[in-house]
Amino acid sequence: MKTDTIDQPKTFVNTRMKSLFVAQDKKPATLREINLARLTPFQRGLLVMDGTVTRFIEAYTFAPVKVVLLQQRKQILSTEHPWLQLPAGEEVISRQVTLQTPVQEKSVPIIHTYADSLIVPQRLPKSILDGLKSDKQGLGRLLRCSGLEARRELLWCGIETLSDLPSAVAHLEGENFINRAYLVFANQEPLMLINEKFPFE
């Protein structure tokens, strides 16, 4: 069986993956390398796409995706945040959501994504800030509806064993998830750092 990981050199897949994730060598120590051959086409699509994850999941599952807001709060950075280009003492918004679809004849929905974001409010237009007050819209949809010209920059990816989760998704602790991190830029400034986690099994 193939055991390609992003760290392996001189294959088309790994060369291409390294070109997509610009900071793979700086991924957190808690992330393990991904065995690319073990991913399904759906998982590979989620890993590398630079569009709206919600739309992709809806197209794949033929089901409406519900954005469930788990937690959102303002916090003050205790140290400098180099990825967001912010000094210590700046205010950010911490936001955690799940993207899930209903299952017929079952009360428990399927969780496709758990997303943890740090957002720089002073760099966002009022329409997005107002939209953040709703628990029914994902960040991708808010960005698109705002008309803001934004781009995504993929940073790193890996396999993560989830821990320290909000109570609503605490049952996922100990499970392995595919993790990817990326920045959203507009006007040459980072607006948010997003960590998206997708079920591995």
Which residue ranges define each predicted feature?
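N-terminal domain-onset segments
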Residues: 2-178, 184-201
